C-alpha cells in the first residue's frame, strides 16, 4: 500500500509558480558589450536616451564611469549639461553638438582608445551615446568598436532603423512604443526578451541632474596623507642657517656605522 506524500509534489509546484516572474528587471550588459543598438521612432529613442543617461548616472560614481554624448540638438539636451559624468580632465564637457566640438572630442576619444590599447590601463569606464553619429562610423575611432569592451568602453547607437546600425552590435534594443520594447542578442537571434519601460520628462531628468551636479567626493589615497615636499630647515629642526652647528654635527656624526637614506618624515 502506497502512502501519498504531499512534499513530493512541492518542488514541481514551486517551479511552475516561479517559472515566470512578473515585473522582473531587464537589463543590457554594457560592461561586456562592444556596442549596443537602439532602434525605434524618434520620440521613443529620446525617451530611452534619457532613461539610460539617468540610470547610469545615479548608479555609478562619476570617477568610475564617464559619458560621451553625440547629439544633434543642443537645446533639446540642455538638461544634461551639468551632469558630472560628462566632465573630463580638461575641464570641458564630453558633448558633441557641432563640427567644432566634434573635432575636439573625437581627437580626445581616439587618443584615449589608443592609450588604452597600448598600455592596457583602464582608469575609468566610458559609455558613448551616439544620437547623431557625426561621421564617427568613418572616423579612425570606428576600428576600436569591435573590441571596445576590452578597452573599457561601450558604444550605444540610436537609429530609426536596424539597417543604419554599425557592425559589432552585441545587443539590439527595439522600441515598439514609448512604453514597450524588446532586446535581442546578436549571437542568438531567437533569444528575444520583451520589456516595459517608463518614460520620464525633461523636467524630471533635469531635476535629477541638478541634484547630482553639486556632489563632490574627495578621493582617499596616499596623496592626501603624505607631504609632497619638505624643506631642509624642517628636516634639520632649525629656524635659521645660524642654528646649524656644523662643527658639532660633524664631530657627533658616525656615518661609518650605517648608510642611511631618507625615506620620509616621522
For the regions a protein language model found, what residue spans apply to each?
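Accessory regions of macromolecular translocation/handling assemblies
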Residues: 1-266
Amino acid at each position: 500500500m502506497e502512502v501519498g506524500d504531499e512534499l513530493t509534489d512541492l518542488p514541481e509546484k514551486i517551479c511552475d509558480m516561479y517559472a515566470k516572474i512578473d515585473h522582473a528587471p531587464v537589463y543590457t550588459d554594457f560592461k561586456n558589450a562592444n556596442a549596443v543598438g537602439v532602434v525605434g521612432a524618434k520620440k521613443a529613442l529620446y525617451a530611452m536616451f534619457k532613461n539610460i543617461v539617468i540610470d547610469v548616472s545615479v548608479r555609478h560614481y562619476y570617477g568610475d564611469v564617464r559619458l560621451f554624448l553625440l547629439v544633434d540638438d543642443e537645446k533639446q539636451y540642455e538638461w544634461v549639461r551639468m551632469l558630472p559624468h560628462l566632465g573630463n580632465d580638461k575641464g570641458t564637457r564630453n558633448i558633441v553638438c557641432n563640427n567644432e566640438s566634434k573635432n575636439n572630442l573625437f581627437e580626445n576619444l581616439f587618443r584615449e582608445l589608443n592609450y588604452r590599447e597600448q598600455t592596457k590601463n583602464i582608469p575609468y569606464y566610458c559609455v558613448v551615446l551616439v544620437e547623431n553619429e557625426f561621421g564617427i562610423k568613418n572616423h579612425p575611432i570606428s576600428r576600436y568598436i569591435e573590441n571596445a569592451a576590452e578597452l573599457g568602453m561601450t558604444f550605444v547607437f540610436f537609429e530609426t532603423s536596424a539597417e543604419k546600425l554599425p557592425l559589432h552590435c552585441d545587443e539590439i534594443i527595439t522600441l515598439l512604443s514609448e512604453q514597450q520594447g524588446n532586446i535581442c542578442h546578436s549571437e542568438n537571434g531567437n533569444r528575444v526578451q520583451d520589456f516595459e519601460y517608463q518614460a520620464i520628462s525633461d523636467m524630471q531628468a533635469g531635476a535629477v541632474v541638478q541634484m547630482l551636479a553639486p556632489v563632490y567626493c574627495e578621493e582617499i589615497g596616499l596623496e592626501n596623507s603624505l607631504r609632497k615636499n619638505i624643506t631642509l630647515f624642517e628636516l634639520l629642526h632649525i629656524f635659521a642657517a645660524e642654528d646649524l652647528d656644523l662643527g658639532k654635527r660633524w664631530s657627533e656624526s658616525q656615518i661609518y656605522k650605517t648608510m642611511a637614506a631618507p625615506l620620509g618624515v616621522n
